[in-house]
């Protein structure tokens, strides 16, 4: 039995599992297997081969840049370069279709511009490349790839050393000297992942519990840092803390305690895996007493590796409400699972996002450009979507602005059609008749024969609490937050007039397009209730309790 203390407090219980918990644990593992949570040995071997190839490509990249800066051949060879992994792959909780979070570490003479130009060009020449999108403006600049059937997210960190040998580790804090914040954030991923595995009592128990929580979070659409929800590392740290509190528990018990504890957690009390470390470097460490910005974090989960950062800084008022509601639901279901009234499959039931709200905003990013350039544009829009959510949250009458954590994409051949007509039709049920007259293109390959328009849409659900104005009409004005969002997007270096487009439109529940529902899912029905009309002094008929969307329309597609 493990009696060691892990974390910042004594454990709550050091008891081992009960017979019932062991039975529930076996059922959990079986449910995870049934849902394809574990990858085959052959698929895992392929990941290793791809990472081995990328190690060679990184060394080629560093060598090429070194030679361009007049280094001798031997010095350029010695400059090195190394690939590290982090996230779900390094934690050992990846499954079929999971991406590989990959860190490229380079010596001081290689720049981030080199990463997005020289290295990206080296990758483009590879026959295994299927898709590439460079997003240099992201909070952590990133290259997103589909490579030989595997999704890879590449980030870069430049160390203040002349060479990066293959035996380099990232444990030494002195490696963090004289780095900018982007490099620190990039390095933190691998360093945090390694520390998490060292701070849990039983890694196998932790990994199975984390697989469960990851699957739950994905099914309930509360997984995605960029959208304002915890990402993979944050969920991992939340699970790890429960493992510390119950060091001898099995995974099923960890999951039950997870929901019970975090439903009652006194936010914004931080979740810590170990005490926050000070260090000799002039780098910022998370400290709400010192930094006002850190006091704004709503559900802080603090990384264990120095310098400690908040992994959940993106959580907004709206996404916090959604997360807490899902934790509460999970806690209730776990009680029923324990009582034998429900099974693990009930915990993993799919979300109801596209049934939940009466009104939605649909944000459309469109490009008359290559697949790569469109991914760059839509990736930028995605990275800024949280800014729109923050602006909507403070609009009068908006209780919740709930972003959906996945996008939907289509490509059409333009022919003689007007791009704005296509954009105006995209994302709504009523626009689908027009879109069916177009030739869709399933291929992301670029060709000169056809001019294509590529579209990606994102949805934000709106929970509204509107008060009546003097004329008895309920109104919502979101012109200002939408106009501000347009300004941010059009001010980007990714935006080119006439090539890139951005549009925000209001969509009622019954007007959502068909592609947001899976085969077999029933669409929500339009209410047959008729609304009372009133005659205004100007003689115009208006609907009493008018839909707030009608006064909130903000369409612009240039």
UniProtKB/Swiss-Prot annotation:
Name the cofactor(s): Mg(2+); Mn(2+)
Query: One cellular component GO annotation, for this chain's record?
Result: nucleus
- Cofactor: how and how many bound: Binds 2 magnesium ions. Also active with manganese.
Point out the annotated site residues (description: Interaction with RNA).
144, 313-314, 386, 391, 484
Question: Where is composition skewed (Low complexity) in this entry?
Answer: 547-558
The Swiss-Prot or TrEMBL record describes its family as follows: Belongs to the poly(A) polymerase family.
What else does UniProt say about it? The C.albicans mating-type-like (MTL) locus contains, in addition to the genes for the regulatory proteins (MTLA1, MTLA2, MTLALPHA1 and MTLALPHA2), a and alpha idiomorphs of a phosphatidylinositol kinase (PIKA and PIKALPHA), a poly(A) polymerase (PAPA and PAPALPHA) and an oxysterol binding protein-like protein (OBPA and OBPALPHA). PAPALPHA is not represented in the genomic sequence of strain SC5314 because that haploid assembly includes the mating type a allele of this locus.
Put simply, this protein is called Poly(A) polymerase PAPalpha
Instruction: Supply the source organism for this entry.
Output: Candida albicans (strain SC5314 / ATCC MYA-2876)
**Organism placement in taxonomy:** Eukaryota, Fungi, Dikarya, Ascomycota, Saccharomycotina
């Amino acid at each position: 039995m493990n009696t060691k203390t892990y974390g910042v407090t004594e454990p709550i219980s050091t008891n081992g599992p009960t017979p019932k918990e062991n039975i529930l644990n076996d059922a959990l593992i079986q449910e995870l297997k049934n849902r394809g949570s574990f990858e085959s040995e052959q698929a895992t071997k392929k990941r290793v081969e791809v990472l081995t190839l990328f190690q060679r490509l990184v060394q080629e990249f560093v060598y090429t840049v070194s030679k361009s800066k007049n280094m001798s051949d031997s010095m350029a060879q010695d400059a090195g370069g190394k690939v590290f992994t982090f996230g779900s792959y390094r934690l050992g909780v990846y499954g079929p279709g999971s991406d590989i979070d990959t860190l490229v570490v380079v010596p001081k003479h290689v720049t981030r511009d080199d990463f997005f130009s020289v290295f990206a060009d080296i990758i483009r020449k590879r026959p295994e490349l299927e898709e590439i999108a460079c997003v240099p403006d992201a909070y952590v600049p990133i290259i997103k790839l589909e490579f030989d059937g595997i999704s890879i997210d590449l980030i870069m960190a430049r160390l203040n050393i002349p060479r990066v040998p293959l035996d380099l580790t990232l444990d030494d804090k002195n490696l963090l000297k004289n780095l900018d914040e982007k490099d620190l954030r990039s390095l933190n991923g691998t360093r945090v992942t390694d520390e998490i595995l060292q701070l849990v009592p039983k890694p196998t128990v932790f990994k199975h519990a984390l697989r469960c929580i990851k699957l739950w979070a994905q099914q309930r659409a509360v997984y995605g840092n960029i959208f304002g929800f915890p990402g993979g590392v944050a969920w991992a740290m939340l699970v790890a803390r429960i493992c510390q509190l119950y060091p001898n528990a099995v995974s099923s018990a960890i999951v039950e305690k997870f929901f019970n504890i975090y439903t009652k957690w006194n936010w914004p009390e931080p979740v810590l895996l170990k005490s926050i470390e000070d260090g000799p470097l002039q780098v910022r460490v998370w400290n709400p007493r010192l930094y006002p910005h850190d006091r704004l974090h709503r559900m802080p989960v603090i990384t264990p590796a120095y310098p400690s950062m908040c992994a959940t800084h993106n959580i907004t008022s709206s996404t916090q409400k959604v997360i807490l509601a899902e934790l509460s639901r999970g806690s209730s279901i776990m009680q029923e699972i324990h009582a034998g009234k429900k099974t693990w499959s009930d915990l993993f039931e799919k979300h109801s996002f596209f049934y939940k709200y009466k009104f939605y905003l649909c944000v459309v990013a469109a490009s008359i450009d290559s697949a790569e350039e469109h991914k760059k544009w839509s990736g930028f829009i995605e990275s800024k979507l949280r800014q729109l959510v923050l602006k909507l949250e403070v609009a009068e009458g908006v209780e919740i602005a709930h972003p959906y954590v996945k996008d939907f994409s289509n490509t059409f051949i333009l022919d003689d059609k007007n791009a704005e007509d296509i954009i105006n039709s995209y994302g709504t049920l009523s626009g689908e008749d027009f879109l069916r007259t177009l030739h869709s293109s399933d291929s992301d390959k670029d060709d000169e024969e056809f001019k294509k328009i590529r579209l990606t849409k994102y949805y934000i659900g709106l929970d509204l609490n509107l008060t009546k104005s003097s004329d008895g009409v309920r109104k919502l004005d979101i012109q200002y937050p939408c106009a501000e969002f347009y300004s941010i997007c059009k001010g980007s270096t990714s935006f080119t007039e006439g090539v890139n487009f951005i549009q925000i439109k209001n969509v009622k529940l019954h007007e959502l397009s068909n592609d947001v529902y899976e085969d077999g899912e029933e669409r929500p029905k339009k209410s047959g209730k008729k609304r009372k009309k009133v005659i205004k002094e100007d003689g115009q008929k208006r609907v009493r309790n008018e839909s707030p969307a009608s006064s909130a329309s903000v369409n612009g597609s240039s």
